């Protein structure tokens, strides 16, 4: 159907790889809808050309040059830059209905039935179920709605600093008005919830249609071994409870996306990695007396797409942490997050 579309957003080349895997997974499961990606100026020209091979439309979005109220809103609230770009999806009035999907989602089955739903249909957020998660939602493009969202963003901002806060404020009746607009969790299965409610995942996980890689570590931040089809992370990722979803992401990437990136010169041919090693590298590698050629070759044949975003972790003593708690300054987004506290309790209860 040409008047309905799946829409995603990429703000840089790293997220573009996620968008490419998402688009490939939608095609793999034979969607009949058009595929649209919104891209910001930070996406390179070469990557845009790759996106054009997977998506039916690549729409450049630059809020600063938009010439509409989005520009004025950005001037007033510069912290909402990416959020305003995502809200731009409501301006795609060439489509009668769309499903927005974040670039860190992966489709596991055909989900064209989502277009039978009405605006705004979304799944509950695992952190606060009375709010919906904005990683997957059904909406109806409208200039009027778009302008109303921009006005809300300008006047009130976002309670969580992102699009999810604005959208939950705008569609505030979602929690109580119409249960038909509550998508089953299988349409937005968050990687975090797999850990927090493992028994439910064991029962219902096989029915999942969309997995959402929430959190700081994204699939493209892992290192993938094509020979063993395994993934690993340089940083400890407590949410990697079920790596089969990550492996599935990488399988689609290596099969469908990697050849395109190589074709457009964005990734060197992985088969030639060993051959281009200089004599100096080999000399240094073998000088320790313990390294074997096959070990070095294997190590550099692994695929790694990007660094994990740096996250400052200053040392805080137990006494300092206790004082902060007593002063109401707990680090709810970091060391004192619910997941970290739960893991600590689990170790004592085992």
UniProtKB/Swiss-Prot annotation:
Divalent metal ions. Required for self-glucosylation. Manganese is the most effective. The modification N-acetylthreonine is found at residue 2. It is an enzyme of class 2 (transferase). UDP binds at residues 9, 11-12, 15, 77, 102-104, 212, 215, 218. Self-glycosylated by the transfer of glucose residues from UDP-glucose to itself, forming an alpha-1,4-glycan of around 10 residues attached to Tyr-195. Changing residue 195 to F: Loss of glucosylation. Changing residue 83 to M: In GSD15; loss of autoglucosylation. UDP-alpha-D-glucose binds at residues 9, 11-12, 15, 77, 86, 102-104, 133-134, 160, 163-164, 215, 218. Residues 301-333 are annotated as: Interaction with GYS1. It is linked to Glycogen storage disease 15: A metabolic disorder resulting in muscle weakness, associated with the glycogen depletion in skeletal muscle, and cardiac arrhythmia, associated with the accumulation of abnormal storage material in the heart. The skeletal muscle shows a marked predominance of slow-twitch, oxidative muscle fibers and mitochondrial proliferation. Polyglucosan body myopathy 2: A glycogen storage disease characterized by polyglucosan accumulation in muscle, and skeletal myopathy without cardiac involvement. Most patients manifest slowly progressive, hip girdle, shoulder girdle, and/or hand and leg muscle weakness. Polyglucosan contains abnormally long and poorly branched glucosyl chains and is variably resistant to digestion by alpha-amylase. Part of the GYS1-GYG1 complex, a heterooctamer composed of a tetramer of GYS1 and 2 dimers of GYG1, where each GYS1 protomer binds to one GYG1 subunit (via GYG1 C-terminus); the GYS1 tetramer may dissociate from GYG1 dimers to continue glycogen polymerization on its own. May also form a heterooctamer complex with GYS2 (via GYG1 C-terminus). This is Glycogenin-1. The lineage of its organism: Eukaryota, Metazoa, Chordata, Craniata, Vertebrata. The gene is GYG1.
